[in-house]
Regions:
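Catalytic Walker B motif of ABC-type/P-loop ATPase nucleotide-binding domains
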Residues: 159-163
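Helix-to-loop junction immediately C-terminal to a conserved catalytic motif
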Residues: 48
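Conserved ABC transporter NBD signature motif
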Residues: 56-67
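Conserved ABC ATPase "signature" region
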Residues: 100, 113-130
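ABC ATPase NBD coupling module
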Residues: 65-81
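Conserved ABC ATPase signature
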Residues: 134-138
Length: 231
């Protein structure tokens, strides 16, 4: 369980938001929708333990990320996967290089296993045979899906995705819908940050919880009772 209490952020002499409370249950898929410049990326960095809030605190399984044990906070950050909205990498890198880096960050995966898993993950996101491609030559959609697949190689317990649904594009929405819900069913906590939620996703998720400038949706997972599930 990730809980945030009375979160506040002050920027450029003004209050971006203050007094916000969040609760994200384990093994679930969540989507936080908010308008441009509302602080979605900043919120994810606070929840990951990367940026201390100006007010409030974040608790993981009842333990404070910012006022508690530093070792716990480091372990938490190591357990998190993160797909950023803006991806800046060496133009010379290939997709395989990206997976190699992910394997090292995940405490090491044998080369043969890494390649097999990378092939499967790329196939899952609609990019079979992409290991040799140069990242600089990928489209916006291909890049979003590639970085997502590379983070999944690590097997993170918590996956934060910033703008991945929008970046991947409309043709990939149903694939991502199934993937994120399957990850949640397998025990991964998925937290997505987007400007808007796809209409079919919103219909299936039901009423959102308003929190400051954000609306928080819990996506239904396979095996649970759902309404209006996208077809």
């Amino acid at each position: 369980m990730i809980e945030a209490f009375r979160l506040g952020v002050f920027s450029r002499g003004a209050t971006l938001w203050d007094g916000l409370d969040f609760a994200f249950g384990d093994a679930a898929a969540w989507l936080v929708a908010g308008p441009p410049s509302s602080g979605k990326t900043l919120l994810l960095s606070i929840l990951r333990g990367e940026r201390r809030p100006d007010a409030g605190d974040v608790l993981v399984s009842g333990e404070s990320l910012y006022r508690g044990n530093a070792a716990l906070a480091r372990a938490w950050r190591a357990s998190c996967g993160h797909v950023p909205e803006q991806t800046i990498v060496d133009a010379r890198l290939t997709v395989e290089d990206l997976f190699r880096r992910s394997a090292l960050a995940g405490c090491g995966v044998r080369e043969r296993e890494r390649k097999d898993r990378a092939d499967r993950l790329l196939g899952m996101v609609g990019l079979p045979g992409a290991l040799g491609w140069r990242i600089a030559e990928l489209s916006i959609s291909e890049r979003a899906r590639t970085f997502l697949a590379a983070e999944l190689l690590r097997g993170p317990k918590i996956l934060f995705c910033d703008g991945v649904v929008a970046g991947a594009g409309i043709p990939c929405r149903e694939m991502l819908w199934g993937l994120f819900r399957a990850l949640a069913r397998a025990g991964t906590t998925v937290i997505l940050a987007e400007r808007t939620i796809p209409e079919r996703w919103a219909s299936a998720a039901g009423d959102a919880e308003p929190v400051g400038p954000f609306r928080v949706y819990r996506l239904p997972v396979p095996g649970a009772a759902v309404k209006g599930e996208p077809g």
